[in-house]
């Protein structure tokens, strides 16, 4: 099953309990995250022209230098965490990367001086913190049932992990802010400052695909 999903495995790089695997699937996700991180580092933020209510003239929204530095740094952290999540083949380490991406997503919009953006990020932050319970809880239950968290070893163990997979998927949904939790995150995307905001989309998309690959593998 693992070969049919991930493609050919070129090799692994172990760092103690942390194991990075280089397969066709993981390399594509890793390169995508790295390329977009470089684009974020080199690109200046967009300038938005907002229509004003009961006014003829439009308002030009410009990202200040201090705001730019914070958001660029958090977008780069988000990209690095996403790239790491693409390569790791340890379930606990993947959960750590997933949590770090959720924190970075909040950090990307934390410097925006708009009440509705900060309210949305606060609500998303609450959901992300709650989602860590099923995320790490499912990893703990898998470890207790199988004795390992290695994505290479779990497919070899003949044990039903359906309940643990469902809980892990629920934790991932909360961390990435997809349905049914998208409502708390939607307003964050209206904040000015692309491509930093697009990093939230990209990281969520890559992590969803990676989680599906992991759940089908184990």
Curated annotation (Swiss-Prot):
Keywords: Cell membrane, Membrane, Transmembrane, Transmembrane helix. The chain crosses the membrane at residues 19-39, 92-112, 124-144, 161-181, 196-216. This is Uncharacterized protein MJ0522. It comes from the Archaea. GO terms for cellular component: plasma membrane. The keyword 4Fe-4S does not apply. Pfam families: NADHdeh_related. The lineage of its organism: Archaea, Methanobacteriati, Methanobacteriota, Methanomada group, Methanococci. It is found in: Cell membrane.
């Amino acid at each position: 099953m693992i070969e049919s999903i991930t493609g050919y495995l070129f090799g692994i790089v172990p760092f103690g309990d942390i194991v990075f695997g280089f397969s066709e699937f993981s390399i594509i996700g890793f390169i995508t995250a790295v390329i977009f991180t470089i684009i974020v580092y080199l690109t200046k933020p967009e300038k938005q022209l907002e229509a004003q209510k009961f006014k003829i003239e439009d308002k030009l929204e410009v990202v200040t230098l201090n705001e730019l530095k914070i958001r660029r740094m958090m977008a780069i952290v988000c990209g690095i965490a996403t790239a790491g999540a693409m390569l790791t083949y340890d379930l606990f380490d993947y959960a750590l990367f997933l949590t770090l991406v959720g924190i970075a997503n909040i950090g990307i919009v934390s410097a925006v001086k708009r009440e509705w953006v900060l309210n949305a990020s606060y609500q998303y932050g609450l959901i992300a913190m709650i989602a860590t319970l099923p995320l790490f809880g499912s990893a703990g239950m898998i470890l207790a049932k199988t004795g390992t968290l290695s994505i290479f070893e779990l497919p070899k163990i003949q044990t039903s992990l359906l309940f643990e997979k469902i809980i892990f998927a629920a934790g991932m949904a909360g961390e990435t802010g997809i349905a049914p939790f998208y409502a708390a995150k939607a307003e964050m995307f209206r904040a000015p400052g692309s491509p930093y905001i697009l990093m939230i989309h990209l990281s969520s998309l890559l992590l969803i695909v990676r989680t599906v690959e992991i759940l089908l593998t184990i």
